């Protein structure tokens, strides 16, 4: 199964960071022109993935403005849930990205309204885990509102390590128009950030989805039960422990529904 997953994710065992940056910027430019959209929108958390995707987006629109004389724009959106504990990291990311526009929308009131509506309708309280997914979906809703208003595309940060584990919210951070980090694993993303001269604090920041109130700042690796180094090694075709391989492959099968459009009677992938 390892070779099948490597083929699906498109991860290369070795990359040229400079060349990968060029190719991914070119992809953003070509698709933006193809669609006729006026720019790009991306949520910025202060983590590795959005920092990298954000910088690629800004480079892409700057190059397009120079090449086409059209006013393409990039909107970087801060989407905190109330007061974000690592706000300084988010500000550091914005300083690195240098976006055309930096917007801020606090999603806490909208999430609270959604929770209240659910409780009123059902008489039940949504679990903390499900509330975390509601936060992710509210963030994406806001990004699509902004994109619709300005005639832009929404950029996602999904990469190979997230894809194989399904470590994203369906119709939340998994919903977007284009994913410039596809085909990269976690350590390769770091390589691109170093090539772009990102602050070391952004590159080495402990990854966290930070969605659960009861477990704030829960590290991804703790939630996954495996390390990104193990996942990256697997995706590069290396041997990892039998236990970790079995866990990763079982997880890949379990989250298969996230890799497809809504299932229909004509589909057979799930059988």
Curated annotation (Swiss-Prot):
Pathway named in the protein's UniProt entry: Cofactor biosynthesis; NAD(+) biosynthesis; NAD(+) from deamido-NAD(+) (ammonia route): step 1/1
EC code: 6.3.1.5
A cellular component annotation (GO) from this entry: cytoplasm
Keyword Ligase in annotation: yes
GO biological process, one term: NAD biosynthetic process
Binding site for deamido-NAD(+): 137, 170, 177, 257-258
Binding site for ATP: 43-50, 157, 186, 208
Chain sites annotated for binding Mg(2+): 49, 162
Molecular function in Gene Ontology: ATP binding; glutaminase activity; metal ion binding; NAD+ synthase (glutamine-hydrolyzing) activity; NAD+ synthase activity
Catalytic activity: deamido-NAD(+) + NH4(+) + ATP = AMP + diphosphate + NAD(+) + H(+)
Presence of keyword Magnesium: yes
Pfam families with a match to the protein in the record: NAD_synthase
Alphabetical keyword list: ATP-binding, Ligase, Magnesium, Metal-binding, NAD, Nucleotide-binding
Broadest EC class assigned to this enzyme: ligase
NCBIfam families: nadE, PRK00768.1
Functional summary from the UniProt entry: Catalyzes the ATP-dependent amidation of deamido-NAD to form NAD. Uses ammonia as a nitrogen source.
PANTHER family: NH 3 /GLUTAMINE-DEPENDENT NAD + SYNTHETASE (PTHR23090), NH(3)-DEPENDENT NAD(+) SYNTHETASE (PTHR23090:SF7)
Protein family membership: Belongs to the NAD synthetase family.
Binding partners and assembly: Homodimer.
Protein name, as recorded: NH(3)-dependent NAD(+) synthetase
Species, as recorded: Exiguobacterium sibiricum (strain DSM 17290 / CCUG 55495 / CIP 109462 / JCM 13490 / 255-15)
Highest classification ranks of the organism: Bacteria, Bacillati, Bacillota, Bacilli, Bacillales
């Amino acid at each position: 199964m390892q070779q099948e997953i490597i083929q699906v994710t498109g991860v290369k065992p070795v990359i040229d960071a400079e060349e990968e940056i060029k190719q991914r910027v070119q992809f953003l430019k070509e698709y933006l022109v193809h669609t006729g959209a006026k720019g790009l929108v991306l949520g910025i958390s202060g983590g590795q993935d959005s920092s990298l995707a954000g910088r690629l987006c800004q480079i892409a629109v700057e190059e397009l403005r120079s090449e086409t004389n059209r006013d393409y724009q990039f909107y970087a959106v801060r989407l905190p849930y109330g007061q974000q504990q690592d706000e300084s990291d988010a500000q550091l990311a914005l300083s690195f990205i240098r976006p055309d526009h930096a917007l801020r929308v606090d999603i806490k009131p909208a999430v609270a309204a959604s929770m209240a509506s659910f409780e009123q309708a059902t008489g039940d309280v949504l679990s903390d885990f499900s509330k975390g997914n509601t936060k992710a979906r509210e963030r994406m809703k806001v990004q699509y509102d902004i994109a619709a208003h300005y005639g832009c595309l929404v950029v996602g940060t999904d990469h190979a390590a997230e894809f194989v584990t399904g470590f994203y919210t369906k119709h939340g951070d998994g919903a977007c128009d284009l994913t410039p980090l596809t085909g990269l694993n976690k350590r390769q993303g770091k390589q691109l950030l170093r090539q772009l001269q990102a602050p070391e604090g952004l590159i080495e920041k402990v990854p966290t989805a930070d969605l659960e109130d009861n477990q704030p700042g829960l590290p991804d690796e703790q939630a996954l039960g495996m390390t990104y180094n193990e996942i990256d090694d697997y995706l590069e075709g290396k041997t990892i422990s039998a236990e970790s391989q079995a866990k990763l492959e079982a997880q890949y099968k379990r989250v298969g529904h996230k890799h497809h459009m809504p299932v229909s009677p004509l589909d057979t992938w799930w059988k």
